[in-house]
Amino acid sequence: MDNHGILESLLFTAGDEGLDEKQLLEILDISKDQLVELIENYSSHGLIIQRFGTTYVLTTKKEASMYIEQLIEQKSQMKLSQAAMEVLSIIAYNQPLSRSDIELIRSINSDGAVKTLIAKGLVEAKVVNEQRSQQLITTDLFLNVFGISNIEDLPTTEEDDEEMDAFFSNLVNQKGENND
């Protein structure tokens, strides 16, 4: 693989954080001038390499923004299965918790629902307090989708029934069913 391909792979893997110039020079074993030349000659159909200070990030070209916005809009209208909704509510109200905790609560294997929630970006697995198993927590996208600013804004049994009904109506609407 040539240095263009390696550079692209490294920046893709680094994601939004990008890679520092020093890291790239060390990994690619090239000079700063060679790195600048690689970046200037980088060509991809939909991607560019942008520099922010000493950090390089692989980003999409501006010409693709309209299509990316459509994708984001579609994702915001995501539909979830009943099982995924159950698992999501269990995680939201009890986080952090492990997959085995969810199975204990639901009395059924929930791996498929968990994988769906992770793939949709609503849940992520993290190591919390050095526990052996990864713990599942909700993401900022979860908060955004459900219109709350922090997890404490979730309705509780102490809140009035109208607020609870509105929240769960929103859940059902996200799932794609009607209340009729």
Curated annotation (Swiss-Prot):
It comes from the Bacteria. InterPro entries: ScpB_csome_segregation, WH-like_DNA-bd_sf, WH_DNA-bd_sf. One of its GO terms (cellular component) is cytoplasm. GO terms for biological process: cell division; chromosome separation; DNA replication. Gene3D superfamilies: Winged helix-like DNA-binding domain superfamily/Winged helix DNA-binding domain (1.10.10.10). Keywords: Cell cycle, Cell division, Chromosome partition, Cytoplasm. It is found in: Cytoplasm. Participates in chromosomal partition during cell division. May act via the formation of a condensin-like complex containing Smc and ScpA that pull DNA away from mid-cell into both cell halves. Homodimer. Homodimerization may be required to stabilize the binding of ScpA to the Smc head domains. Component of a cohesin-like complex composed of ScpA, ScpB and the Smc homodimer, in which ScpA and ScpB bind to the head domain of Smc. The presence of the three proteins is required for the association of the complex with DNA. HAMAP family: ScpB. Belongs to the ScpB family. This is Segregation and condensation protein B. It comes from Staphylococcus aureus (strain MRSA252). The gene is scpB.
